[in-house]
Amino acid sequence: LQDGAYHEVDSSEMAFKIAGSMAFKEAARKAYAVILEPLMAVEVTTPEDYMGDVIGDLKGPRRQIRAMDERAGARVVQALVTLLDIFGYVGDLRSKTQGRASFSMQFDSYAEVPQHIAKKIVAKVRAQ
């Protein structure tokens, strides 16, 4: 808003609401908007025999292994994984490790969704 002033005849609460709404829409149209997705800090504890399968699962284009340790005779893998990639992971982990691995996660941060995925999301929302 530039050079705004109140005038007893021309100014009203509704006029200011409309002007504010128009300014917000214009700013949103000019802004570079991105879609963000949650990244989860994942920790998998597994027997040594299944380490290769676990690492294979946690590697990928939107997954990042942060650290690998040994704790109480088991291997521990810490990774960052998108929340979308975590859905269904517990079942996959159990089947690949015969139920011997454990898994925990907590929110870590947000990251920008890759452009090719963002375009699909926008197209899907616009189609509704």
Swiss-Prot record:
Alphabetical list of InterPro entries matching this protein: EFG_III/V, EFG_V, EFG_V-like, Ribosomal_Su5_D2-typ_SF, Ribsml_uS5_D2-typ_fold_subgr, Transl_elong_EFG/EF2_IV
Q: Which Gene Ontology BP terms does the record give?
A: ribosome disassembly
List, alphabetically, the GO terms of the cellular component aspect: cytoplasm
Where in or outside the cell is it found?
Cytoplasm
Q: Which CDD domains match?
A: EFG_mtEFG_C
Keyword set includes Cytoplasm = yes
Q: Which SUPFAM superfamilies match?
A: EF-G C-terminal domain-like (SSF54980), Ribosomal protein S5 domain 2-like (SSF54211)
**What is one Pfam family matched by this protein?**
EFG_C
Keyword Magnesium listed? The answer is no
Q: Name one GO molecular function term.
A: GTP binding
List the keywords (alphabetical): Cytoplasm, Elongation factor, GTP-binding, Nucleotide-binding, Protein biosynthesis
Family statement drawn from the similarity comment of this UniProt entry: Belongs to the GTP-binding elongation factor family. EF-G/EF-2 subfamily.
Query: According to its UniProt entry, what is the function of this protein?
Result: Catalyzes the GTP-dependent ribosomal translocation step during translation elongation. During this step, the ribosome changes from the pre-translocational (PRE) to the post-translocational (POST) state as the newly formed A-site-bound peptidyl-tRNA and P-site-bound deacylated tRNA move to the P and E sites, respectively. Catalyzes the coordinated movement of the two tRNA molecules, the mRNA and conformational changes in the ribosome.
Q: Which PANTHER family match?
A: RIBOSOME-RELEASING FACTOR 2, MITOCHONDRIAL, TRANSLATION ELONGATION FACTOR G-RELATED
Under which name does UniProt file this protein?
Answer: Elongation factor G
Origin organism of this chain?
A: Planobispora rosea
What gene makes this protein? fusA
